[in-house]
C-alpha cells in the first residue's frame, strides 16, 4: 500500500467516480442555504437532500463529492479519541434512482483495492442480517465469508421513523494487533476500538416507512455513501490517529512554536499519562481551529447567537487549552495560514485572521474579568465552591470550568462537580426545545417571555421614552444589575440585527445612569432584546437614543444593497440571487451565485448603474401588503417568508419603478442620500459564490479613492524606477493630471502602470537573456530525459529562463527546472515539451505544501524548500 497525502486521496476519489460517470460536485458552504433544519452542513449528502426528495432535478443521477462538514454534538470526545472531529471532510458517491447495491459494492471494492491498493485481506464488511442480497454481492466480489459480519437494525439499518430508509453495509480496515489484541469480537459486538477502523458506509435507500412501522419498497432506490477523508489519511499514511496525518500534524507543529511543550506521536503506544494530556490539548486546538477558520471563511460570525455561539465556544476552549500548554500570547489567529495551506479551499485569509484575533483579545479580557467575579463569589469559610455558580460563570461569561477549578485549587477550595453537572444537564434540557441559537438559549432557559410584548418605533423615531419590562442575565430574571445584562423595553427605537442589517447603536438613560447598547437581537416572538453595558434597574422609566450617525450609515448601506442587487440583475441577468448580505455603518457585502468572476467591465457597469439611481433622486416607499400582492407587484423575496409573523401584513421597500424588495430593515428616504457608491472588491467566497464589497457616502468614497490614488502613485514610481535601473535613459510618458475627477485619474494611472509593466517585462527578458550564460547549461540524463536543474536563479528571471531553455535546446526530451530559494521557500518553474509540466508541478506542490500550476509546457509556483528537492524531482519524472 503506497503512502498517499490527503490531497492525493481526495483527488483519487473524485477521479475514480468521475471515470464511473459520476458528476463531480464541488464542496458547498458549511452554512446551509434555505434549510432551517440544519445549523451546519453535517454530512456529504446534506447539500443534496432536495435531489433525493425530488424537490429539485439533479444535474446528473450519479454524483460524487468531497464535502466539508461540521458536527459539534460530541465535543467532549474531540482530542480524547483517535477519530472524533468537529470539522471533517466526507467523501461521497451517490446514485439517485440509477445504480444500486451491485454497482455500489463493486465500486467500493475496486476503489479500495485497485486504486488505493489496500490489502484486501485487511478489509472487513458488515451488512444488515436480513440483507442477504448485499452479502451475496460481497461474496461475488471475492470477500471471504469470515470477513463478513452480520449486524442488527441497531447497527446496520438507517431509519428516521418515517420516510425513506434502508439497510447499510460498512467497510472496516484492520490495522493489526498492535492497536488491539482482541480480534473480531470487537466488530461483532460493536465495541469502540482503534484496530478495526470504519472507512466507508454505504446506505441502500430501499424502503419507505409510513411512520407506523409499515415498510414498502421504493420505486426509486438510491445510494448514499460516506467515507471519512481523515480516517483514510491516517490509514494510508500508517499513523496512529487522524491527528498524526498531514491534515493535522502541520497545524500541531505550528502550535508547538508558541508552546514550551511538544506533541509526541509515539506516546500513543508509550501511554505516558502526562504526555497524553499534553497531546490531547494540542489535538483539541488543531481540531477546533480547523472548524473555526472554515466556518468564518464561509461567512459565519463570532457572536452569542447560533453558529456564532459555537465558534465562540470553540475559540475560547482552544484559547484555554493554549494556556494549559504554557502559551501566554495571542496565537490562534496565527494558525490561519497553516490551516488554509492544508486544505483546498480559497477565501480571504485576512478577514478570518481579523475575526479570530478580535475574539482572542475579547476573551483575554473576559478571563481577567472572570477572575475578579470568581473572587467576589468566594466564601473563605467554605472549602467547597457551588458548582451551579461555576456553571453560571461558564455559560454567562465564558469562564472555563477548568480555570475556575485551577484558581480555587490554589486556595485549597474544590468545586462541587456534581452540582456543576446537574446545572449543565438542566441547561441542556431547557435548550433542546428551541432552535440552536444563542438568543433562544437565553429565552428558553429562563422561560421569561411567552408572547410579543414590545413596540418598535425605530422606522420613524430615533428616540423613545419607555418603561422597563424585564431585566435578566442568561440564567435568571433580575431586578437590576451593576455592569450589564439583557433588557426588554416596552417601547424601543433600536433596530435589531436581521435581514443582513446590523443593529443600531446608542444609549439608554435611566436616572443618572447612561447605559451603552452593545447588541440588539430578536427573540422567537419578535421582541427586541438589548444587551447593554452599565447599571440599570427594572422600576425607573428610561429614555432611549439611537446614534443618528450610525443609523444613517446603516441606512445608506442597506439601501445601497437593494440598489446593487437590482443593478446586478440588470447587468448579469435576472437569475442572480441574493445568497447573503451584511451591512454596517461603514460598508456592505453582497453574496451572489456565479460560475465565474464578473469582468471588470461588468463591475464598472453595475457601479455606474447604481450611481445613475442616486442621480435620479428616487423616493423610497414602505408598503405593507400580503405575500401574494407583493409577488404581483414584482417584489423580490430575498428573505425567508418565515421571518414575518403574519404573511397577511409583510413589508415591501420600493424605490420607484427600479426595485421592490421584501425587507424589514431601515432605509434612506431618497436614493440621492446615498451620495456616492464604490465597489472596492469582488472575491470568490466559495465554489460558485462571489462576494462584492462596497462603500457609500461621498466622504467614505473620496477617502477610499484618495488612498487608492496614493498607492497607485507609489506603484507608478516603483515601476518607473525599476525600468530606469534596466534602461537609464528611459523617459516615462506623462499622465494627464487634468482628469475630471480622481476616479478617472486613478483609472488613467492604472492603465499607465499596466503599460509600463509590459515595458519592464520586455526589458527584463532582454536583460535576463544577456546576463544568463546559456553556454554553461549542461543537461543530466534522467529516465531518458535531458534535464537541467538550477535553483539559484534570481526570482524575477525564473519563468523567462525556464521558457528560454525549453525553446533554445530542442533536444526532443528537454526538461528545464529553474528555481529561486528564499529562506525556506522555493519559487519553481518547470518548462518542457516532453512531459506534462503542470502535472509534475502539482505532484511536487502536493508533497511540499505548494501552490501554483500552469499549462503542459510551463508551470510555476511556490512551495516549501527541501534539501531533497532534486531527488524528489527525479522521482516525479514519469518513465520515458
From Swiss-Prot:
PANTHER family in the record: ALANINE--TRNA LIGASE, CYTOPLASMIC (PTHR11777:SF9), ALANYL-TRNA SYNTHETASE (PTHR11777)
Cofactor note: Binds 1 zinc ion per subunit.
UniProt KW keywords: Aminoacyl-tRNA synthetase, ATP-binding, Cytoplasm, Ligase, Metal-binding, Nucleotide-binding, Protein biosynthesis, RNA-binding, tRNA-binding, Zinc
EC number: 6.1.1.7
Location in the cell: Cytoplasm
Cysteine disulfide partners in this protein: none
Top EC group: ligase
Cofactor: Zn(2+)
SUPFAM superfamilies: Class II aaRS and biotin synthetases, Putative anticodon-binding domain of alanyl-tRNA synthetase (AlaRS), ThrRS/AlaRS common domain, Translation proteins
Cellular component terms per the entry's GO annotation: cytosol
MF-aspect GO terms: alanine-tRNA ligase activity; aminoacyl-tRNA deacylase activity; ATP binding; tRNA binding; zinc ion binding
GO terms under biological process: alanyl-tRNA aminoacylation
Domain of life the protein comes from: Bacteria
Residues given in the record as Zn(2+) binding sites: 558, 562, 663, 667
Alphabetized InterPro entries for the sequence: aa-tRNA-synth_II/BPL/LPL, Ala-tRNA-lgiase_IIc, Ala-tRNA-ligase_IIc_anticod-bd, Ala-tRNA-synth_IIc_core, Ala-tRNA-synth_IIc_N, Ala-tRNA_ligase, Ala_tRNA_ligase_euk/bac, DHHA1_dom
General function of this protein: Catalyzes the attachment of alanine to tRNA(Ala) in a two-step reaction: alanine is first activated by ATP to form Ala-AMP and then transferred to the acceptor end of tRNA(Ala). Also edits incorrectly charged Ser-tRNA(Ala) and Gly-tRNA(Ala) via its editing domain.
Entry comment, domain topic: Consists of three domains; the N-terminal catalytic domain, the editing domain and the C-terminal C-Ala domain. The editing domain removes incorrectly charged amino acids, while the C-Ala domain, along with tRNA(Ala), serves as a bridge to cooperatively bring together the editing and aminoacylation centers thus stimulating deacylation of misacylated tRNAs.
Record-given protein name: Alanine--tRNA ligase
